[in-house]
């Protein structure tokens, strides 16, 4: 009789679970994702397609190749409606390290425990150690990074932004 039980258990679940995706985010995050989705869905048909991606990237001054757009579209298992968009972001965000792990990685180079690292020193570390960044990648990182007038990179705030998004200027 036990062999019948094991047969019924092994039948389920090759499917992607999207039903709980809305529970992963609070209302304000869902609203921000909805606004982003609507900006990308240029033709307003409720789905993001290759043309929508191209138009959105072009509006940002980028000129993406067909191969690049195809690679982006292939990350989705099917048509990208809002639920799929949210699911994909949830998977990406769940794939990042926990906040304390990221913060502690930066803290290793913060000998004074100030919560900041001198931006030139951090650039040197990022371009010469481990999985090396290019100067362009560091420039992109610094573009929206919390760096004060003295050139101190606030890694505590940066980690918060990385995991939770930037605060609005109005806040």
UniProtKB/Swiss-Prot annotation:
Residue(s) carrying Phosphoserine: 19
A GO-annotated cellular component: cytoplasm
Keyword Calcium in record: yes
Describe the location of the EF-hand domain by residue ranges.
28-63, 97-132, 133-168
Report if keyword Phosphoprotein is assigned. Answer: yes
A GO biological process held by the record: platelet aggregation
Q: Which UniProt keywords apply?
A: Calcium, Metal-binding, Motor protein, Muscle protein, Myosin, Phosphoprotein, Repeat
User: What name does UniProt use for this protein?
Assistant: Myosin regulatory light chain 12A
Q: What does this protein do?
A: Myosin regulatory subunit that plays an important role in regulation of both smooth muscle and nonmuscle cell contractile activity via its phosphorylation. Implicated in cytokinesis, receptor capping, and cell locomotion.
Subunit comment: Myosin is a hexamer of 2 heavy chains and 4 light chains.
Q: Which GO terms describe its molecular function?
A: calcium ion binding; myosin heavy chain binding
As stated in the Swiss-Prot or TrEMBL entry, residues carrying the post-translational modification Phosphothreonine are: 18
PTM summary from the entry reads: Phosphorylation increases the actin-activated myosin ATPase activity and thereby regulates the contractile activity. It is required to generate the driving force in the migration of the cells but not necessary for localization of myosin-2 at the leading edge.
Miscellaneous field: This chain binds calcium.
**Entry superkingdom:** Eukaryota
Positions annotated to bind Ca(2+): 41, 43, 45, 52
PANTHER family attached to this UniProt entry: MYOSIN REGULATORY LIGHT CHAIN 2
């Amino acid at each position: 009789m036990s062999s019948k039980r094991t047969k019924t258990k092994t039948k389920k679940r090759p499917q992607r679970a999207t039903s709980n995706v809305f529970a992963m985010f609070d209302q304000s995050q869902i609203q921000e994702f909805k606004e982003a989705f609507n900006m990308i869905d240029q033709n307003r048909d409720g789905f993001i397609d290759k043309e929508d991606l191209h138009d959105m990237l072009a509006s940002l001054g980028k000129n993406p190749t067909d191969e690049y757009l195809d690679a982006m579209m292939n990350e989705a298992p099917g048509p990208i409606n809002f639920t799929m968009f949210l699911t994909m972001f949830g998977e990406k965000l769940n794939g990042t390290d926990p906040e304390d792990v990221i913060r502690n990685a930066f803290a290793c180079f913060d000998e004074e425990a100030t919560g900041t690292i001198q931006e030139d020193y951090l650039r040197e570390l990022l371009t010469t150690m481990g999985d090396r960044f290019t100067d362009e990648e560091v420039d992109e990182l610094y573009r929206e990074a919390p760096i004060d007038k003295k050139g101190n990179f606030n890694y505590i705030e940066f980690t918060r932004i990385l995991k939770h998004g930037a605060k609005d200027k109005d806040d």
